């Protein structure tokens, strides 16, 4: 993209179009000696009007976009964690209820075989051992 690419034909300086147009004295003659050739600009020089995408978006806009993206991701993560914790809580409650039910059934089976007082003593002993083990 040269500096003259986005101009109308009439607006383009003659040095870019007409090879016979008078040269500026400051330019001097060409190194290769081909003075009859048309003057051309460098193909891609950023100072001549090629604007990259990063220059179009200002830093503040990119920063705002990045912050919004971070907030969105944080909120999404928070919702996922909340959902996961609710699921884990339900599972833990279900396990606890099943354990209590299984223990109750076990004591009932023991009660059919043994005397009631002996079952009560065993229950207390197991509870004591469980508390000691958890310490």
Swiss-Prot record:
Swiss-Prot/TrEMBL keywords: Coiled coil, Nucleus, Ribosome biogenesis, rRNA processing
InterPro entries: Cgr1-like
Coiled coil: 60-118
Record GO cellular component, one term: nucleolus
Compartments reported by the entry: Nucleus, Nucleolus
Sequence ranges of Basic residues compositional bias: 112-128
Record family assignment: Belongs to the CGR1 family.
Pfam families: Cgr1 (PF03879)
Region (Disordered): 1-33, 110-135
Compositionally biased tracts (Basic and acidic residues): 11-33
Name of protein: rRNA-processing protein CGR1
BP GO annotations: rRNA processing
Its biological purpose: Involved in nucleolar integrity and required for processing of the pre-rRNA for the 60S ribosome subunit.
